[in-house]
Amino acid sequence: MIILGIDPALGSLGWAVVAKETAQLKYLASGIIRTNSKDAMHHRLAFINSTLEKVILEYQPNMAAIEETFVNTNSVTSLKLGYARGAIMSLIGRYNLDMREFKPNTVKKTVTGYGHAEKDQMLHMIKLLLSGTALITNSDEADAVAIAYTCLVTKNY
């Protein structure tokens, strides 16, 4: 089972690919997709879509796991995040991948044992749980790894 974990965002989207081989979890790759806030929205969304598509084609995941979002007090921010999620979900659907969504607190509790863990705690635990993640320093990337990890360890596939 190969999971593509996604921490959705418009400016700095985290992605990660984690596999389960027999009882062993294996980190395969991760990264950040950054868009320029000065670019037109449709160009930013197209860039997210085309970059994630390359990841899907390279790693051939069986499923995508994405973090659920909550409505922010800033409606413009929530709307922009919704655009990014729509572009991501459209791509997931185009490749006929199953998809699971996880609440941020569920991911934090699965990885750290505490549903309100801070970013640095998440990063630390990801490095302990999955070999190959030692060079990850970006919290968006670490969150994507954590989302994929959560999908695999909760057997939510």
Swiss-Prot record:
Pfam families: RuvC (PF02075)
One of the GO biological process terms: DNA repair
Compartments reported by the entry: Cytoplasm
Annotated residues for binding of Mg(2+) 2: 67
Alphabetically ordered keywords of this record: Cytoplasm, DNA damage, DNA recombination, DNA repair, DNA-binding, Endonuclease, Hydrolase, Magnesium, Metal-binding, Nuclease
Reactions catalysed: Endonucleolytic cleavage at a junction such as a reciprocal single-stranded crossover between two homologous DNA duplexes (Holliday junction)
EC number assigned by the record: 3.1.21.10
Chief site of localization: cytoplasm
CDD domains: RuvC
Cofactor: Mg(2+)
Catalytic residues identified in the record: 7, 67, 140
UniProt GO MF annotations: crossover junction DNA endonuclease activity; DNA binding; magnesium ion binding
Protein's UniProt keywords contain Nucleotide-binding: no
InterPro entries named in the record: RNaseH-like_sf, RNaseH_sf, X-over_junc_endoDNase_Mg_BS, X-over_junc_endoDNase_RuvC
Binding site for Mg(2+) 1: 7, 140
Cofactor note as given: Binds 2 Mg(2+) ion per subunit.
A GO CC term assigned to this protein in UniProt: Holliday junction resolvase complex
Function: The RuvA-RuvB-RuvC complex processes Holliday junction (HJ) DNA during genetic recombination and DNA repair. Endonuclease that resolves HJ intermediates. Cleaves cruciform DNA by making single-stranded nicks across the HJ at symmetrical positions within the homologous arms, yielding a 5'-phosphate and a 3'-hydroxyl group; requires a central core of homology in the junction. The consensus cleavage sequence is 5'-(A/T)TT(C/G)-3'. Cleavage occurs on the 3'-side of the TT dinucleotide at the point of strand exchange.
Subunit structure: Homodimer which binds Holliday junction (HJ) DNA. The HJ becomes 2-fold symmetrical on binding to RuvC with unstacked arms; it has a different conformation from HJ DNA in complex with RuvA. In the full resolvosome a probable DNA-RuvA(4)-RuvB(12)-RuvC(2) complex forms which resolves the HJ.
Homology family: Belongs to the RuvC family.
NCBIfam families: ruvC (TIGR00228)
Matches recorded under PANTHER family: CROSSOVER JUNCTION ENDODEOXYRIBONUCLEASE RUVC
Protein name per UniProt: Crossover junction endodeoxyribonuclease RuvC
Naturally occurring in which organism (per UniProt): Rickettsia rickettsii (strain Sheila Smith)
Lineage of origin: Bacteria, Pseudomonadati, Pseudomonadota, Alphaproteobacteria, Rickettsiales
Gene designation per UniProt: ruvC
